[in-house]
């Protein structure tokens, strides 16, 4: 394994307009990864924690408290949609820039894909999940945050599982 030759720590301010549509989010992610263009491989880019959280709040129109009263399942539907957009955009970006991508995190139940069932979640609990992609855009790991800060105590803690991932540059 050769070490990563290009490392990019993305610094980004979260502004609602970057999260209102899938297209706006895609443009933002690609703009933030632009410094990777023309750099030597293997590349690793890391987004800040909770980079994906505003998708839950702003995607397809803001989350109105009144809507929550009318529809208690709304957070789960919104999380599923936000997770889908986050996953697709980040996978596409990993492929486009040929980079391993640690895609910040979002609050969501952890989803899995199966051919027969499509996308489903084994647990209804929200976790602070970081997604890790390879340069082909494949999701290698969903890593739940281990140590929760006090406001996050209502989230389900991540159990420590097989979160070491083999890359061209060794284990991450």
Q: Where in the sequence are the language-model features?
A:
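A short, hydrophobic beta-strand-centered structural micro-motif
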Residues: 83-111
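Active-site catalytic loop in hydrolytic enzyme cores
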Residues: 109-172
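Short catalytic/ligand-binding loop motif for oxyanion handling, primarily in non-cytosolic enzymes
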Residues: 17, 53-56, 109-113
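A short acidic, glycine-rich active-site loop
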Residues: 67-88
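Transmembrane beta-barrel domains of bacterial outer-membrane proteins
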Residues: 22, 28-29
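Active-site-proximal beta-strand elements of phosphoester/diester hydrolases
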Residues: 3-22, 129, 142-145, 170-172
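Active-site beta-strand/loop signature of hydrolases that rely on acidic residues for catalysis
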Residues: 7, 30-63, 68, 72, ...
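Catalytic metal-binding/acid-base residues of hydrolase active sites
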Residues: 13, 51, 106-107
């Amino acid at each position: 394994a050769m070490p990563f030759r290009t490392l990019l720590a993305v610094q980004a301010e979260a502004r609602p307009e970057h999260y209102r549509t899938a297209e706006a989010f895609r443009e933002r992610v690609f703009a933030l990864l632009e410094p990777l263009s023309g750099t030597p491989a293997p590349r690793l880019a890391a987004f800040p924690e909770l980079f994906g959280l505003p998708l839950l709040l702003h995607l397809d129109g803001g989350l109105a408290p009144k809507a929550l009263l009318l529809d208690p399942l709304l957070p789960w539907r919104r999380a599923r949609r936000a997770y889908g957009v986050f996953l697709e955009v980040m996978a596409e970006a990993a492929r486009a820039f040929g980079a391993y991508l640690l895609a910040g995190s979002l609050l969501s139940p952890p989803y899995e894909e199966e051919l027969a069932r499509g996308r489903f979640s084994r647990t209804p609990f929200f976790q602070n999940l970081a997604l890790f992609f390879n340069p082909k855009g494949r999701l290698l790991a969903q890593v739940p945050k281990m140590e929760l800060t006090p406001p996050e105590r209502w989230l389900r803690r991540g159990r420590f599982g097989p979160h070491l991932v083999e890359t061209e540059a060794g284990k991450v």
